[in-house]
Regions:
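N-terminal secretory/targeting leader peptides
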Residues: 2-128, 138, 143-362
Length: 362
């Protein structure tokens, strides 16, 4: 274990012990008072931001309310305590007990983590939840994070995203060449191989980068969040579908020592709070996106466009190569890929005669 990880873990342990000691007074009937805990939670999102930001905060507030204050959580938005992309490190070191973000932000540390946010042309929200909760995905996720002293939980999903905002038309595959676009995860590598330049930026920097021309295009989430950022004021063309993020799962991560210090009832509360947010957030997006899309349709400065078929076909083909290469160089990714696609193949067959068939008939 690295020295900073050891010291960070000791900091978490010291906080837990000190808090438990303070609460060890006896209750009125002579029995020990329940232990209480004081945690800090960092996120990758702007403060009070619709959907992801509010959803992340709801995990903390639900835990505190359901525990009757036995777990108090101080919540920090992205950049307030640690940079937006350093949530994983802060929790892994034990600097804080808890974090909320997206697993594909950690690809430089653990490539296979990208499976637990989104794979281009992969699972949607419903399928991700089925795989994680019932198909063995969550067990693989926890196995992957164990060396980092982290316990992950699914804690939100935006639903299928939009393809992004562009300051140039995409009429063919050739139009992707030289395109400088904010796009993370495997989607970014796919764009690079298609001739573009992927850029990773936290949400708070996207508008300025797009408005000033530092980037030519950006994906963010969908109408609900994109209007909140004013992206419709920074670019003209709004493309769909979101091939790169069909059902991105967000994560809540807890430092292992902090997790193991909790009694069984508080562990259940943490798990259920994450699950509650995982259910509510997609509903928030389905509602918010429907309303925001109407606003965008009324905005004459915005053109809503579908990616050409040849562009989608090329991106899908590249995705297969990227995923295969990831598995070839990373045994953990190979195990996860096998489980992921085994379930996706079964689910896709079912979707074609259920959800997909219904939507085509509606």
């Amino acid at each position: 274990m690295k020295r900073r990880q050891f010291l960070g873990g000791m900091a978490v342990a010291a906080g837990v012990v000190a808090c438990a000691k303070q609460e060890a007074d006896c209750s009125g009937d002579g029995s020990p008072a329940p232990q209480s805990f004081s945690w800090s939670m960092v996120t990758s999102w702007p403060p009070k931001f619709p959907g992801i930001g509010v959803g992340a905060e709801s995990v903390g507030t639900r835990i505190e309310a359901a525990s009757g204050g036995r777990i108090k959580i101080k919540i920090y938005a992205g950049g307030e305590l640690v940079p937006a992309f350093e949530v994983f490190d802060a929790v892994s070191r034990g600097t804080v007990e808890m974090g909320h973000g997206a697993a594909y932000y950690h690809k430089g540390k653990v490539d296979a983590a990208q499976y637990f946010t989104a794979i281009p042309f992969g699972m949607n929200n419903l399928e991700m939840n089925a795989w994680l909760y019932k198909g063995g995905g969550l067990e693989l996720w926890r196995e992957l994070y164990e060396p980092f002293d982290l316990v992950p939980f699914p804690a939100g999903n935006t639903g299928t995203q939009m393809g992004g905002w562009f300051n140039k038309e995409i009429n063919s595959v050739d139009d992707l060449k030289g395109l400088k676009m904010r796009i993370p995860g495997i989607g970014g590598e796919v764009l690079r191989r298609a001739g573009g330049t992927p850029v990773t930026l936290p949400g708070s920097e996207i508008f300025t980068a797009l408005q000033t021309g530092a980037i030519d295009a950006t994906e963010w989430i969908g109408p609900y969040n994109d209007i909140a950022f004013g992206l419709n004021k920074a670019a003209k063309y709004y493309y769909y579908p979101g091939w790169h993020e069909p059902g991105p799962t967000l994560e809540c991560i807890v430092h292992r020592q902090a997790w193991e210090s909790l009694p069984a009832d508080l562990k259940a509360i943490v798990e259920l709070a994450c699950m509650s947010t995982n259910v509510e957030m997609p509903a928030d997006y389905a509602h918010g996106n429907a309303i925001a899309l109407e606003q965008l349709k009324a905005d004459t400065s915005v053109e809503l466009r579908k990616f050409p078929d040849d562009v989608i076909d090329r991106l899908r083909s590249i995705t297969r190569d990227v995923v295969a290469e990831l598995s070839a160089r990373d045994p953990a990714a190979a195990r996860i890929e096998k489980s992921y696609y085994a379930f996706l193949d079964k689910s896709a067959a079912n979707q074609r005669i259920s959800e997909q068939a219904y939507l085509e008939a509606r």
